[in-house]
């Protein structure tokens, strides 16, 4: 079964173009299922003998370990994807996980930052032209700050370009870090994005993102010029050593700027994607067009964003209408 799991992980990574987190999570979930199928000192139950009753026993086993419903639901989703892959590769004839219902989860509608909040945050991002004091360090009991190195002074230009692009295009973080130079049509301000399932879409970006990118290109050239070894000459967003930036690094960078802003904003890359869709919807954009821009396979996925918009409209109505 281990070889099948390795092939499944390769399928997620290279065919589904899944994010590193999804690959790690789903791989871990399936390995946990393999552990469940293997009694102490015994042999693993063959996949061909796994039916929906075994899947239900696994779900009960997860609950016995005090796992939350949302975690159980994700592991069940991983098994559905795994067995779908197994059917395709003819390791099994059916998908037993498809016959087991997902635990009912509370429908939580996330708060989406207003356009004003996002604009204030973006306007407050450093441009990277001036040297900045870096976090304090203690030496001999004294707190001291240090000046940023020449390369560190330039990193805010990269960071601003990334964050502007996340909001301008509604990108997934995996799509952002996967961008290559060939993804851009600079003259037309269009971006070719490789999304989930290796599906390609074209997304426009606006003037502010364009300005941020134009400020970043010389920084990128400098990183490549000073890099040791063989840098990634195709990747758009680079770390200081010339390698492709990771999605984990993007999350850290965004969190850092939220802390520097001193506001109550708790932004994640997906927060900007959600805000992108909600703000377009609030300004009258067609839901089908938003679906295309986000790269959603199903309109029902895009419709989740309407729930937040309706709640915001109701709040305005309740506050403003004399008979509310």
Per-range role (PLM):
Residues 1-324:
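Conserved catalytic core of the tyrosine transesterase superfamily
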């Amino acid at each position: 079964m281990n070889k099948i799991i390795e092939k499944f992980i390769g399928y997620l990574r290279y065919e589904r173009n899944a994010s590193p987190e999804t690959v790690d999570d789903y791989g871990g979930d399936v390995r946990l299922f393999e552990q469940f199928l293997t009694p102490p000192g015994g042999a693993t139950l063959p996949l061909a003998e796994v039916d929906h009753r075994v899947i239900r026993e696994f779900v009960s086993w997860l609950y016995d370990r005090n796992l939350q419903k949302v975690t159980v639901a994700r592991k069940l989703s991983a098994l559905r994807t795994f067995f779908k892959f197994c059917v395709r590769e003819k390791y099994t004839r059916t998908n037993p996980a498809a016959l087991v219902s997902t635990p009912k989860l509370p429908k939580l509608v996330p708060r989406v930052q207003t356009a004003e909040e996002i604009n204030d945050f973006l306007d407050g991002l450093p441009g990277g032209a001036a040297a900045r004091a870096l976090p304090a360090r203690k030496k001999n009991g004294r707190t001291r700050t240090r000046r940023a190195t020449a390369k560190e002074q330039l990193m805010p230009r990269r960071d601003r370009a990334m964050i502007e692009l996340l909001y301008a295009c509604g990108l997934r973080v995996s799509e952002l870090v996967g961008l290559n130079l060939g993804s851009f049509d600079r003259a037309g301000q269009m971006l070719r994005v490789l999304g989930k399932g290796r599906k390609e879409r074209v997304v426009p970006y606006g003037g502010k993102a364009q300005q941020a990118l134009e400020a970043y290109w010389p920084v990128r050239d400098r990183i490549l010029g000073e890099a040791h070894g063989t840098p990634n000459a195709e990747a758009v967003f680079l770390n200081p050593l010339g390698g492709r930036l990771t999605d984990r690094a993007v999350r850290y960078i965004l969190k850092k700027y939220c802390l520097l802003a001193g506001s109550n904003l708790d932004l994640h890359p997906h927060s900007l994607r959600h805000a992108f869709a909600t703000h377009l919807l609030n300004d009258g954009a067609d839901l089908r067009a938003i679906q295309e821009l986000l790269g959603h396979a199903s309109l029902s996925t895009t419709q989740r964003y309407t729930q937040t918009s309706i709640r915001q409209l109701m709040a305005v109505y309740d506050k403003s209408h004399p008979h509310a």
